[in-house]
Amino acid sequence: AEDPNTTKDFLIKIERFATTMVFDMKEWGEKDPVGLTSSNDAAALLPLMGIIMPEEPAGPVVKAADGAARITTFKTLTKDGHNPTLVPAITAGTLFTGVFSINISSTLKSTKFGLPYNKKPSKFSFTYKYTPGSPVYQSVEKDGRNHAVLVDDKDLDQCSIAAYLFEVSSYDETLDGTNVNTSSKVILKAELTDGTAKSDYQE
């Protein structure tokens, strides 16, 4: 017979996975499109290091007039025109799935890429257009500082769009900026092969 004075507590854990990843940019949080993470939090720290940021746009990733995400690369320099090696002279705007958690000792480890996914992806598609910077600068390290050097090659400035599928042994394990392009855990990669200027939206 059951003892009416005895109770048991059970903890039920439910795993939830995304079955469809669609990011249409229609809904935005305080800084980023819902479901995505940007480099905005990192850019917010740059003025604390003496970096001069432009007033427009307000950050590396903002909502454009047509509703798209506008991603901008900045020349991130101090008033005297250079930086310590901690900050590159050219800082690219980024938008990705995952989380941003600042790592002062290794800034590339601040981006923790990816979301748990337990389905076989059937396709990866996106819509974009791209305007290269003008003039074109390249970040060059010299004498322990990063400098923005003017480059004659206009084709050097191209956009980069890629999707990675990787296998890990636990949900706490992620890839970051130091290993996403070299890790053996990456089993599939889709990448834009033509990053040159596109004045109209491409799919």
Residue map of PLM features:
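Extracellular structured ligand-interaction cores
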Residues: 20-22, 66, 112-114, 118-125, ...
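Short carbohydrate-recognition loop motifs
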Residues: 62-86, 90-93, 98
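Solvent-exposed strand-to-loop "edge" motifs in beta-rich extracellular domains
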Residues: 25-27, 74-76, 114-133, 140-148, ...
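Extracellular/lumenal carbohydrate-interaction signature centered on repeated Trp-anchored short motifs
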Residues: 88, 92-124
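Short coil-to-beta strand junction motifs in C2/discoidin
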Residues: 141-161
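Extracellular carbohydrate-recognition regions
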Residues: 4, 8-59
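Surface-exposed coil/turn segments at beta-strand junctions on protein surfaces, enriched
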Residues: 5, 16, 117-119, 197-199
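Extracellular carbohydrate recognition and processing domains
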Residues: 170-203
